[in-house]
Amino acid sequence: MKKSTWIRITNRRNEKLEKIHVNHVDLFYEKAGQGRPVVLIHGNGEDHTIFDRTAHLLEEKFTCYLPDSRGHGKSQWTGEFHYRDMAEDLIQFLEKLNLRDAAVVGFSDGGIIGLLAAARTNRITSLVACGANTRPEGLRILCLTGMKIHHFFSRSPLMRLMIREPDIRDEELAEIHADTLIVAGQHDLIRKSETDHIASEIPGAEEVILPGESHGSYIVHSEKLAEIILDFLDGKRGEKF
């Protein structure tokens, strides 16, 4: 089956990737820097290189792990996708590499994966979830409608994932005990009410809405995300935003 070409992001770092086998799939990832582990999870149809500028700034203080999610980049194509499987990929990734006190930064689908994983493992002690939703209806109606039309013609498994899932329950959000920052752009594809709800259901979570930003404008090949991460992990708690 041909891979989806929706929002295909090209590899710009030309780095040497490492391979790991978790949850019955082979994942490829980049590792750089030294210090506390930070795992950056990209969104649907992308690969880890969207975080090129972010990782460059973080690796002076942290060990950055940038995996390609299953079915993305160079990682194994599985043909069918579910967010809970991808969250299990992340949990086993942390376990197999023996990463503890990890910070997970997820964008869009990566944010969903981060929420699900953080509810199930204490290896994640900090979480930054950007542009995430707990259900398809958390997307703005025009966005969700566009995805359904796209899927009707493409039958893309990755597009089907977004229009049928996630299904994260409030009880699961309440199980997240990591220090959590929920981020969205002012003009995000995610409804503001959805972002507010996620932040309200996670104990002690903080929320930042970035003025003038869209769903991925502060993420993809941008240094703005690194500033947010550094401030959050340094305990500045969004003072600049």
Language-model segments: what does each one mean?
Residues 100-136:
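Conserved hydrolase catalytic core segment
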Residues 65-102, 227:
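Active-site loop/oxyanion-hole signature of alpha/beta-hydrolase fold enzymes
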Residues 1-38, 62, 160, 230, ...:
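Alpha/beta-hydrolase fold catalytic core
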